[in-house]
Amino acid sequence: MVLAAAMSQDADPSGPEQPDRVACSVPGARASPAPSGPRGMQQPPPPPQPPPPPQAGLPQIIQNAAKLLDKNPFSVSNPNPLLPSPASLQLAQLQAQLTLHRLKLAQTAVTNNTAAATVLNQVLSKVAMSQPLFNQLRHPSVITGPHGHAGVPQHAAAIPSTRFPSNAIAFSPPSQTRGPGPSMNLPNQPPSAMVMHPFTGVMPQTPGQPAVILGIGKTGPAPATAGFYEYGKASSGQTYGPETDGQPGFLPSSASTSGSVTYEGHYSHTGQDGQAAFSKDFYGPNSQGSHVASGFPAEQAGGLKSEVGPLLQGTNSQWESPHGFSGQSKPDLTAGPMWPPPHNQPYELYDPEEPTSDRTPPSFGGRLNNSKQGFIGAGRRAKEDQALLSVRPLQAHELNDFHGVAPLHLPHICSICDKKVFDLKDWELHVKGKLHAQKCLVFSENAGIRCILGSAEGTLCASPNSTAVYNPAGNEDYASNLGTSYVPIPARSFTQSSPTFPLASVGTTFAQRKGAGRVVHICNLPEGSCTENDVINLGLPFGKVTNYILMKSTNQAFLEMAYTEAAQAMVQYYQEKSAVINGEKLLIRMSKRYKELQLKKPGKAVAAIIQDIHSQRERDMFREADRYGPERPRSRSPVSRSLSPRSHTPSFTSCSSSHSPPGPSRADWGNGRDSWEHSPYARREEERDPAPWRDNGDDKRDRMDPWAHDRKHHPRQLDKAELDERPEGGRPHREKYPRSGSPNLPHSVSSYKSREDGYYRKEPKAKSDKYLKQQQDAPGRSRRKDEARLRESRHPHPDDSGKEDGLGPKVTRAPEGAKAKQNEKNKTKRTDRDQEGADDRKENTMAENEAGKEEQEGMEESPQSVGRQEKEAEFSDPENTRTKKEQDWESESEAEGESWYPTNMEELVTVDEVGEEEDFIVEPDIPELEEIVPIDQKDKICPETCLCVTTTLDLDLAQDFPKEGVKAVGNGAAEISLKSPRELPSASTSCPSDMDVEMPGLNLDAERKPAESETGLSLEDSDCYEKEAKGVESSDVHPAPTVQQMSSPKPAEERARQPSPFVDDCKTRGTPEDGACEGSPLEEKASPPIETDLQNQACQEVLTPENSRYVEMKSLEVRSPEYTEVELKQPLSLPSWEPEDVFSELSIPLGVEFVVPRTGFYCKLCGLFYTSEETAKMSHCRSAVHYRNLQKYLSQLAEEGLKETEGADSPRPEDSGIVPRFERKKL
């Protein structure tokens, strides 16, 4: 103790040391690395790279450990290194906490705090490496050495030989992503650096010995120098050395020499901030009672800090700072609880019924009451430590049980508790229960559970001695499995039980795991070939799937796992090994928005479906065992079986990003489980009676009587054939397995298929009838239809490059009538799915249809009308085609959905937040996701539309009109983007998703533009013209009109009017861009067919008329890229998307006068409706489309535009007036 104190004092003289100490007291005060914040308690300024959140915890932890050492009989002054003292136990606890902290850091700050995570791993690994390390720490010389280990010369007196040999193990710098604990890069460490040999009883070591370097003080960047990251070196912000006082003997002068590397630093990598460092008080006399200080709160959870404060009894500010450092980014790691020195508190076991921030019971009762009592009696700790010393590596199954990983087979006997669990629910309850938590705690203490440094990121427990296991992925999520909550202040949370996460999840999941959410976001699903079974099977290998949402329209899915750990493990696994369905690589990540899924209208009990799938899976396993015997276990990959090779139908690229590399064939990724899909036997078994699936007894029966499956499934085999044909027929989603995975379906898959077939057939008929009616309503429509077909044939790709694979064939398969039917069907479905906006949209759509019909009639009256009708026919047909395509895949997805849910997607889409998520779908921040988002075009919800919007914006910048379209698309049209990819190729390939859609629409508009400008002006044209005139007079700043149009639930008539204004605009523009800008109006013009489509789409669209417009835009997109783009902009611009639709490129709203209040706010110039005046005038009027329209009108029809604006309310008269003007100007 004296030595430590003296050394700490020595260190104190050094300026940096003292500041570090202060930093420890005042997190972030001393930490030169700003990131340290509270964590940077002892970080010397020289290395300012501490990963802010993670490192704070470590330094404090280190300080706490130092204090404990000082106070402990075996502290610095007591050279009892071989004897596990309470201090060593506490150090072990600190180590565990550090590990936990690192895990959390890894989880939350893998990107920003990679260094910190690495440091934590290293530090924890080092600490865990050996009890001797703790003993060394306790030993005065040891303590001294540690202080300077970070390359800071340590007090020579203290540990002259403790300097870390240059060859000492160096942990990757905090900046590195937690590499394996020992990096063996110690060479960087100055000889003075104290190397803590994992197994050395005393700090001094031969330089040649690889030793754990305590240079944790290094913050952040610490070169991969040494063992503990010389954290002090790296960022030295973490070093507690400056706070030599706080680090009594820990890194007295050495620490100060290091400037940042202090013994405290040892624990806290610079990345972590110096807070983790042990304060001198903790170890030195100053630490009176500070040894009680909480080990090292991993997070600056704030609460933890407060808790830690109480823990520090006579703790000096440094110690307080350490508890404060708990505030690091991970509340889970609480400073206080880390080292419960006193017996004051028995382990407080996690009460599964008691809410915890981490969904996991405190690790092994790690939760301490406010962590004040968090430290367990030193005696108890010592015992624990001793137990820890005898480390027995856990078996894989033991680790899984320890971490609460859902068992693959049930019933399951918990190897930790010897309790038999019969189902996942019971397992979940058991894992969260006190018994399991206690057993895990005891087990961890006795067995010294240590995670193998299998993952650079995370196994913290490098040393058998230290049980402090690095919970690889468990931070918060895995903690729940362990039944320990990291977030609470369980000082012990970090404890041996810390290895809450299965090692498998240790690496990649960290970045994903920012929360304890159980929802996994799956993007890039094959458009037509992904079934619920496929999605659910992705998660089954990792545990129970409690809920899911399959959004076929967006090619996205959300899986809710029973445990956060399972979700994280799943994400991590698939990050390492991409999941592939039908050759499409899936983007799987933790949902950033949803912690759990709540279906507004679960069509069928998800539990039942999932149970069926589980049963099926088990059954498959049994069956395989029977058929293949022991050799069956092909791949250990948890996903091997879960990956559903069932997607047989060709994947539709609309959902998958064009960028996603082709995935292995289903057979490949199926891991030879082709038998599932291709094996009639397997399929029959799968599709066997759903009821048997649900019962495990049935599984047994199946095993006993495998032929029963065949007998049962013979009819289903036929169904299988039907299904196979069906996907080919345009219902790829309805693969033979769409339902096979869901034994729920009371009706056999075949019956379901038959129903679907009947339904679709009926739908097409109804749609055909409706379409015919529309054509009848507008004589020119037939011609338009023909043109649309031609255009379809010409622009199949523009229509939807992404969909082309599946949609093109669909279009080919289905006649225009069928397309119309599908449009109607989609409309119906959408209406069902999107009940909220369905009524409004229907009304709007109806109005639009009527208006469109009227306009068409008007057009028939005039050549322009005829031209417009032609265009409309084209648009309508393409729109129908596109709608049909969309419906095809939607119906497919719905067909799948129907298997599980009612036919209406309405039930399917229904995470209360899913709409939001899809709207923002920031979750998949990947271009693929953007592309995926567009798939949701029909669905009002495009979680990833935001991404699409962003991409779209960029692409739009490339082209003004495309830009505008993209803006609209970005918001509301993102959904269309995927569909329009085909069109996009024709228009512009710059934007794979949104741009594509917009571009195609623009191109089509351009193509039609001549006709439209010449003849295609309908009544709506007048409105559009007025708008344009207004826009011209004002400015052409109306990107938002599209959004407004979408947003506003204006009647379809108005929309119909809008299209003509767009047509006028197109004419006025006379350029493809103009056409594109006005494409949406034109599309609207083609109101009878288009509007019908729009109605369907509107019904489909959750949004109101905007959605219908959006649908309409889609149709138009099919008809013409430019045209579609405009229209897409309008409908795509959803109210929620409006702000996003607006591009800040154009900062000044111009032509605001063109925005007139109607049902919503309608831009006469651009023919767009907006629900929000602000959006219309501020956002839309800044849009490139609006600007262009304004320019053209200002230059060509400024005067006329004003007049027309006055008469904009009367669509036909205005259209009549506007059309000539447009024609003139365009001509």
Curated annotation (Swiss-Prot):
Consequence recorded when altering residue 685 to A: In A10 mutant; does not affect nuclear localization
Annotated region (Disordered), positions in chain: 1-58, 289-374, 624-906, 977-1089, 1201-1227
Biased composition (Pro residues): 43-56
Effect seen on changing residue 177 to S: In CMD1DD; uncertain significance
Effect listed in the UniProt record for changing residue 679 to A: In A10 mutant; does not affect nuclear localization
The keyword Cell cycle is assigned to this record: no
Sequence segments annotated as region (RS): 628-655
Zinc is among the record's keywords: yes
Keywords for this protein: Cardiomyopathy, Cytoplasm, Disease variant, Metal-binding, mRNA processing, mRNA splicing, Nucleus, Phosphoprotein, RNA-binding, Zinc, Zinc-finger
Post-translational modification: Phosphorylation regulates the subcellular localization. Phosphorylation of Ser-635 and Ser-637 in the RS (arginine/serine-rich) region promotes nuclear localization of the protein. In contrast, phosphorylation of the C-terminal disordered region promotes localization to cytoplasmic ribonucleoprotein granules.
Biased composition (Low complexity): 27-42, 636-660
Effect of residue 888 to N: In CMD1DD; uncertain significance
Biased composition (Basic and acidic residues): 624-634, 674-709, 716-738, 753-772, 784-807, 816-856, 868-888, 1024-1036, 1201-1215
Domain RRM: 518-593
UniProt effect for mutating residue 1210 to D: In D10 mutant; mimics phosphorylation; does not prevent nuclear localization but induces increased localization to cytoplasmic ribonucleoprotein granules
Annotated effect of mutating residue 1060 to A: In A10 mutant; does not affect nuclear localization
Entry's transmembrane regions: none
InterPro entries (UniProt xref): Matrin/U1-C_Znf_C2H2, Matrin/U1-like-C_Znf_C2H2, Nucleotide-bd_a/b_plait_sf, RBD_domain_sf, RBM20_RRM, RRM_dom
Domain of life: Eukaryota
Tissue-wise expression: Mainly expressed in the heart. Also expressed in skeletal muscle tissues, ovary, small intestine and colon.
Function: RNA-binding protein that acts as a regulator of mRNA splicing of a subset of genes encoding key structural proteins involved in cardiac development, such as TTN (Titin), CACNA1C, CAMK2D or PDLIM5/ENH. Acts as a repressor of mRNA splicing: specifically binds the 5'UCUU-3' motif that is predominantly found within intronic sequences of pre-mRNAs, leading to the exclusion of specific exons in target transcripts. RBM20-mediated exon skipping is hormone-dependent and is essential for TTN isoform transition in both cardiac and skeletal muscles.
PANTHER family xrefs: MATRIN 3/NUCLEAR PROTEIN 220-RELATED
Subunit relationships: Associates with components of the U1 and U2 U1 small nuclear ribonucleoprotein complexes.
Protein name (Swiss-Prot/TrEMBL): RNA-binding protein 20
